């Protein structure tokens, strides 16, 4: 019984992956707030001609006129 309980605890910890969630700023247009990102990656997207960057979770690809900065620490995209 103890072995079964220990196995369930280990499986739960591995499946939930506690160590890889971080807090990122999330902003579109004029509002700015934080969000928990399960991916463990934050981004800041700077588009030429737009004064405020877009921020969020993940790491989108950059393109012509768009610079994307990705990072992996709490609130690193601020």
UniProtKB/Swiss-Prot annotation:
What PROSITE patterns would the database entry show?
SNAKE_TOXIN (PS00272)
Q: Which UniProt keywords apply?
A: Disulfide bond, Secreted, Signal, Toxin
Q: Could you say which residues form the signal peptide?
A: 1-21
Listed as disulfide-bonded, the cysteine pairs are 24-42, 37-57, 59-70, 71-76
Compartment(s) of residence: Secreted
List, alphabetically, the CDD domains matched: TFP_snake_toxin
**GO cellular component, as recorded:** extracellular region
Molecular function terms, GO-annotated = toxin activity
Is Disulfide bond included in the keywords of this UniProt record? yes
InterPro entries per UniProt: Snake_3FTx (IPR003571), Snake_toxin-like_sf (IPR045860), Snake_toxin_con_site (IPR018354), Toxin_cobra-type (IPR054131)
Which tissues is this protein detected in according to the database? Expressed by the venom gland.
Q: What is its main location?
A: secreted
In terms of superkingdom, the source organism counts as Eukaryota
Family of the protein in this entry = Belongs to the three-finger toxin family. Short-chain subfamily. Orphan group XII sub-subfamily.
Q: What is this protein called?
A: Alpha-neurotoxin homolog 1
What is the species listed in this Swiss-Prot or TrEMBL entry?
Micrurus corallinus (Brazilian coral snake)
């Amino acid at each position: 019984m103890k072995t079964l309980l220990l196995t369930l605890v280990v499986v739960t910890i591995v499946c939930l992956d506690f160590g890889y969630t971080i807090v990122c700023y999330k902003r579109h247009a004029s509002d700015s707030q934080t969000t928990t990102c399960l991916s463990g990656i934050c981004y800041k997207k700077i588009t030429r001609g737009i004064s405020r960057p877009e921020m969020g979770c993940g790491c989108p690809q950059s393109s012509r006129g768009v610079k994307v900065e990705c990072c992996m620490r709490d609130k690193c995209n601020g």
